[in-house]
From Swiss-Prot:
InterPro entries referenced in this protein's UniProt entry, alphabetically: RNA-dir_pol_NSvirus, RNA_pol_PB1_influenza
Similarity remark: Belongs to the influenza viruses polymerase PB1 family.
PTM info: Phosphorylated by host PRKCA.
GO MF annotation, one: RNA-directed RNA polymerase activity
Name this polypeptide is given: RNA-directed RNA polymerase catalytic subunit
Known role: RNA-dependent RNA polymerase which is responsible for replication and transcription of virus RNA segments. The transcription of viral mRNAs occurs by a unique mechanism called cap-snatching. 5' methylated caps of cellular mRNAs are cleaved after 10-13 nucleotides by PA. In turn, these short capped RNAs are used as primers by PB1 for transcription of viral mRNAs. During virus replication, PB1 initiates RNA synthesis and copy vRNA into complementary RNA (cRNA) which in turn serves as a template for the production of more vRNAs.
Gene Ontology annotations of biological process type: DNA-templated transcription; symbiont-mediated suppression of host gene expression; symbiont-mediated suppression of host mRNA transcription via inhibition of RNA polymerase II activity; viral RNA genome replication; viral transcription
Subcellular location: Host nucleus; Host cytoplasm
Biased composition (Polar residues): 55-64
Species for this entry: Influenza A virus (strain A/Memphis/101/1972 H3N2)
Main location group: host cell
Length: 757
């Protein structure tokens, strides 16, 4: 039978059908190959938007830099980065006037954070540009490498463990005439394999010392590595994103802390809150505007889109904002906050891996690294690439491009939101001094603008004034992509508002399904996602019940754990059938052991082990929750774990789920193929680092170490802790005299070894 799809929607209000138009089912597009082309696009576009600025040369690195600030007044419709300093400062002043004490209070809050933050704050985050190896690394490894190099170059302030002291080292490192770094390299040699008697290539990993002069070091310290943004839906072209190195990260963190503190106090800011809290905040602003537009006034809302937000922002503008926000604050505080924007106005963009060439005729492939783009003959490239390279050449130094204007994606979300809100703030009647007025919402580059006026001409005048005011601070509202509606219907950060927020359920679709962590976590995450969507996203009971059944089915296929009495044959069915037959209480078996599903929409909040505990055979309980089971590498039991779920839009969200550690909570082992690559040395460092941290945590359960006091090494701290614990255990009779003596002896030996070293 043919179903006419429009019939499905006859009973559905139009706004509820919005989510069916979203491109959110199926796999998102991923990028392949190098991001070099996208990065060159970004660099070239950014310079084009600011082309009428002044060119200067950085005296330290020799990099050419373009400064568009206070450039020509912008022209209509063309995006441009010519922000006017005095306008930005005035917007800040008015923002402060409307919110007395806001900057002062935020500065005090931030000052406290600055003095207390530990350097391990920087280990959060994923890939980070590691300047010592000139490539991306996990954040913790990149930080460890940086600190190691700092210490071997006599920079030791970081040993206090405070982030601010690590940043002192960063500042000092920039004054050094040269830095000595350790890099990894690999040697290949051909040897005969004893077993097979064939020749094989053996790789050995070495570490070598290398000296870097001041200019090269500065270039590395100011470099942002670039990658292609993956999994972006609804776009034809990919785009580049940046990952900064450890020198920049700490400074950015403090600036964003200050800006976050300000955003929390601004009712128009869509950051840093999210989810339902954000919806409530938005609904308030809308309510205010609709209440005030009595019968005499019209109210219209623009669903706004800004053209190339990041590429028209300017670090110099952020410096002006910070200078204003921190006026009257202590000198050290103002200095530390102004370093991030200064580093960004001298930033370099690393062009990535370069280009791959292949000759079909000769079956040859070769990679042209980014470093060669400055000198290679352009006849090998197609026309569009040739144009890109010609344009970028004057900016190239050692495979990186000088990129003074522009901000790169996602670096100063909070601070740029403050700038956006400061323009929304100017819409009050006391500032517009006429019959129209505006208010709105801002979240990074996304905005919604609500304009009220007595008639249509007034609305038009209000929108024009807003548009022109934005231009003065380097914000370019796109006239093509923004649209206006009677207030009551608009979209903001993928929330659809129609006299209240409409659940956009399709956004959550990608997070339904089996995550692939392990049997225990996957079951827990799966039901938690369904529970959360019932709470937040209008997932009705019938649909939720269906989602649950589909999830269980998916789960059973993933882990091949069909019910013990099923006819389906899989690799596991022999074992599971045997278990099923010898189990008295079959309802007590977990789904992953071939048991029945006892979940329904009323008990989704209970972990499966707890749900079935009373129903389990005793010996099954013993096997399931046995910390001595040799096949399980147990993590310590945390009652709540965090899973990363992928909503369709925006970054991966962290979602809490209840974790009960059982024999199903295994941790998969690392892929072995990494052991044969140049990453091996890094992997060994990482494991070493991990082992030390694990050992340290064994001595200090998380409740007892918050902020280390004084400067003692990890080893000293552990030895003294071991002595104290041993004495307590001995005196309370928990350990024998011989054991106590042995512990004391080991402690003395460790101290002796440290002294000899």
């Amino acid at each position: 039978m043919d179903v006419n799809p429009t019939l499905l929607f006859l009973k559905v209000p139009a706004q509820n059908a919005i989510s069916t138009t979203f491109p959110y089912t199926g796999d998102p597009p991923y990028s392949h190959g190098t991001g070099t082309g996208y990065t060159m696009d970004t660099v070239n576009r950014t310079h084009q938007y600011s082309e009428k600025g002044k060119w200067t040369t950085n005296t330290e690195t020799g990099a050419p830099q373009l400064n568009p600030i206070d450039g020509p007044l912008p022209e209509d419709n063309e995006p441009s980065g010519y922000a006017q300093t005095d306008c930005v400062l005035e917007a800040m002043a008015f923002l402060e006037e409307s919110h007395p004490g806001i900057f002062e209070n935020s500065c005090l809050e931030t000052m406290e954070v600055v003095q207390q933050t530990r350097v391990d704050k920087l280990t959060q985050g994923r890939q980070t540009y590691d300047w010592t190896l000139n490539r991306n690394q996990p954040a913790a490894t990149a930080l460890a490498n940086t600190i190691e190099v700092f210490r071997s170059n006599g920079l030791t302030a970081n040993e206090s463990g405070r982030l601010i002291d690590f940043l002192k080292d960063v500042m000092e490192s920039m004054d050094k005439e040269e830095m000595e770094i350790t890099t990894h390299f690999q040697r290949k040699r051909r040897v005969r394999d004893n077993m097979t008697k064939k020749m094989v290539t053996q790789r050995t990993i070495g570490k070598k010392k290398q000296r870097v002069n001041k200019r090269s070091y500065l270039i590395r310290a100011l470099t942002l590595n670039t990658m292609t943004k993956d999994a972006e839906r609804g776009k034809l072209k990919r785009r580049a994103i940046a990952t900064p190195g450890m020198q920049i990260r700490g400074f950015v963190y403090f600036v964003e802390t200050l800006a976050r503190s300000i955003c929390e106090k601004l009712e128009q800011s869509g950051l840093p809150v999210g989810g339902n809290e954000k919806k409530a905040k938005l609904a308030n602003v809308v309510r205010k505007m609709m209440t005030n537009s009595q019968d005499t006034e019209l109210s219209f809302t623009i669903t706004g889109d800004n053209t190339k937000w990041n590429e028209n922002q300017n670090p110099r503008m952020f410096l002006a904002m910070i200078t204003y926000i921190t006026k009257n604050q202590p000198e050290w505080f103002r200095n530390i906050l102004s370093i991030a924007p200064i580093m960004f106005s001298n930033k370099m963009a690393r062009l990535g891996k370069g280009y791959m060439f292949e000759s079909k005729r000769m079956k040859l492939r070769t990679q042209i690294p980014a470093e060669m783009l400055a000198s290679i003959d352009l006849k090998y490239f197609n026309e569009s690439t040739r144009k890109k390279i010609e344009k970028i050449r004057p900016l190239l130094i050692d495979g990186t491009a000088s990129l003074s204007p522009g901000m790169m994606m996602g670096m100063f979300n909070m601070l740029s939101t403050v700038l956006g809100v400061s323009i929304l703030n100017l819409g009050q009647k006391k500032y517009t001094k006429t019959t129209y007025w505006w208010d709105g919402l801002q979240s990074s580059d996304d905005f919604a603008l609500i304009v009220n006026a007595p008639n249509h001409e007034g609305i038009q005048a209000g929108v024009d004034r807003f548009y022109r005011t934005c231009k003065l601070v380097g914000i370019n509202m796109s006239k093509k992509k923004s649209y206006i509606n009677r207030t009551g219907t608009f979209e903001f950060t993928s929330f659809f508002y129609r006299y209240g927020f409409v659940a956009n359920f399709s956004m959550e679709l990608p997070s339904f399904g089996v995550s692939g962590i392990n049997e225990s976590a996957d079951m827990s995450i799966g039901v938690t996602v369904i529970k959360n969507n019932m709470i937040n996203n209008d997932l009705g009971p019938a649909t939720a019940q269906m989602a649950l059944q589909l999830f269980i089915k998916d789960y059973r296929y993933t882990y091949r754990c069909h019910r013990g009495d099923t006819q389906i044959q899989t690799r596991r069915s022999f074992e599971l059938k045997k278990l099923w037959e010898q189990t008295r209480s079959k309802a007590g078996l977990l789904v992953s052991d071939g048991g029945p599903n006892l979940y329904n929409i009323r008990n989704l909040h209970i972990p499966e082990v707890c749900l079935k505990w009373e129903l389990m055979d005793e010996d099954y309980q013993g096997r399931l929750c046995n910390p001595l089971n040799p096949f399980v590498s147990h993590k310590e039991i945390e009652s709540v774990n965090n899973a990363v779920v992928m909503p369709a839009h925006g970054p991966a969200k962290s979602m809490e789920y209840d974790a009960v550690a059982t024999t199903h909570s295994w941790i998969p082992k690392r892929n072995r193929s990494i052991l044969n690559t140049s990453q091996r040395g890094i992997l060994e460092d990482e494991q070493m680092y991990q082992k030390c941290c694990n050992l340290f945590e064994k001595f200090f359960p998380s409740s007892s170490y918050r902020r280390p006091v004084g400067i003692s090494s990890m080893v000293e701290a552990m030895v003294s802790r071991a002595r104290i614990d041993a004495r307590v255990d001995f005196e309370s009779g928990r350990i024998k005299k011989e054991e106590f003596a042995e512990i004391m002896k080991i402690c003395s030996t460790i101290e002796e070894l440290r002294r000899q070293k």
